[in-house]
Structure formats: C-alpha cells, structure tokens
C-alpha cells in the first residue's frame, strides 16, 4: 500500500522500531522544517537511519531503504534553536522515492504488510525466541522486568519480534538489518541467532570476571597468611649495593 508524501527525519546512530518510544534531539534545518511540517498536518513522520552519521545533508543513497513511520507525541523547542521530540513508531515502511527539492525531505513510501499468517513453524519459532529472551534478560540486567511481563501477554508475532529487537544490545547496523527483514520467519530466525550470541557473550564475560575475582581473592589470602619479612626485601638490597658502587667510584675523582 503506497501512501501520500510524508516528511522524512534522517536519524544518526539510532534505529526506531514500530512500538518503540524514543526521545530525539533535532538540530539540522531540514529536519526542523520536516518536524514543523509534520506538526501542521497529522503529526506523522518517516524515520530513516543514515548509513553514515557524519553526513549532514543526506540524499537517497545516504539513507537506508527501510524505516519506521512514527507519530510525534511531544515537541519542545529549546532556546538554542534545536528541538527535543518524543516519537512513537507505528509501522514499518519502505522508501520508494525521496524528494529533496523543498526545504525539508519528504518521501513516497510503502507500508509493509504485518498481517500474521499463523502456522506451526512460526508458533514454534516465536516460542523459542520468547524462551531465549527470558534467558537473555537473566544475564542482561538492563532489561526491565515489565518488558518480560508485557511480552508474556502478547499474541502478535510481529509485535513480539519488534519488542525483542528493541531490547537487544546489538549495534545499529544489526538493528537496521532486522528492521529491513520484511519476512517474519527470517526476522525471527535472525533475532534467535543474535540472542544465542549475546547470551554466550554475557556468560563468557561472567566466567572471566569470576576467574579474575577468584585469583585476586587467592592472592590476597596468600599475602595475609605470609609471615612478616625479617630481612630487607631484595629490591632494597639491590638499591643499597648500587649506591655503594656509586660511592666507591666517586672516591677516584
């Protein structure tokens, strides 16, 4: 389904998913104009991540083709001319054409179909992803407990996939890869692989920290049990000998 033209907000170093609420700071003139235009219409804006965050005036080749249509929830104009905006992603969409001729970017987009076609394979995959995410939340303490609670009451596989993706501690490119997967089964499989990898990484980190802690405790215990030295440490003897040699040499002058 194609939509009419919609203002575009290029994003630096962040990917916004459907269902995600995100605060954004906007300072570029084009982006400020896009937000103002959005507020004058239906408060809808198309969020597209940039391939390179250092690009100031992106064109179509500088932006990823898959983004998220979002609704502006709050907008606050700051004294320095920048804008703090709170947005909520509503739907996944594909960039069709980009208009750069105005004082803000606008686009023709195609909303991605999210009708859940239920089958046994998808149901099993969703169950595996949910179980893996629960394990992930046990090792990653940054996951709020209410996320698990909310997931347990969800039945929409698309929403489940997006909520899990939002809470994965993977890089921007990896999140963009997931956002751009229109096939739900492929997306869930990719999420599952990232979950397994992240859990392994956290467990390995925990093992290393535990090993280092035990070694430090062992060293400290050995130091506490060692009898006090009655003779000067070897390093002091070596320094003393060096000083004596220096003194003997000085007698010849």
Question: Would you name each region that the model predicts?
Answer:
Residues 1-253:
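N-terminal low-complexity, acidic/polar interaction/targeting segments
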């Amino acid at each position: 389904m194609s939509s009419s033209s919609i203002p575009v907000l290029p994003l630096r170093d962040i990917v916004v998913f459907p269902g995600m609420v995100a605060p954004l700071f906007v300072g570029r003139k084009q982006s400020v104009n896009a937000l103002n235009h959005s507020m004058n219409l239906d408060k809808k804006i198309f969020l597209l991540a940039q391939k390179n965050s250092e690009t100031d005036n992106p064109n179509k080749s500088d932006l990823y083709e898959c983004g998220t249509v979002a609704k502006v929830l709050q907008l606050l104009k700051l004294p320095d001319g920048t804008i703090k905006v709170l947005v909520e992603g509503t739907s996944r969409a594909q960039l069709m054409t980009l208009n750069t001729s105005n004082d803000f970017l606008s686009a023709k987009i195609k909303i991605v179909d999210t009708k859940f076609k239920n089958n046994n394979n998808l149901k099993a995959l969703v169950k595996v992803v949910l179980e893996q995410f629960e394990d992930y939340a046990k090792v990653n303490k940054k996951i709020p407990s209410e996320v698990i609670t909310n997931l347990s009451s969800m039945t929409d596989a698309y929403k489940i996939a997006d909520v899990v993706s939002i809470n994965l501690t993977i890089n921007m490119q990896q999140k963009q890869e997931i956002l751009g997967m229109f096939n739900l089964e492929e997306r869930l499989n990719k999420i599952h692989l990232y979950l397994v990898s992240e859990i392994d990484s956290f467990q390995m980190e925990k093992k290393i920290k535990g090993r280092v802690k035990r070694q430090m405790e062992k060293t400290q215990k050995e130091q506490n049990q060692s009898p006090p030295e009655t003779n000067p440490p070897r390093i002091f003897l070596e320094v003393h000998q060096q000083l004596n040699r220096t003194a003997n040499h000085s007698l010849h002058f």
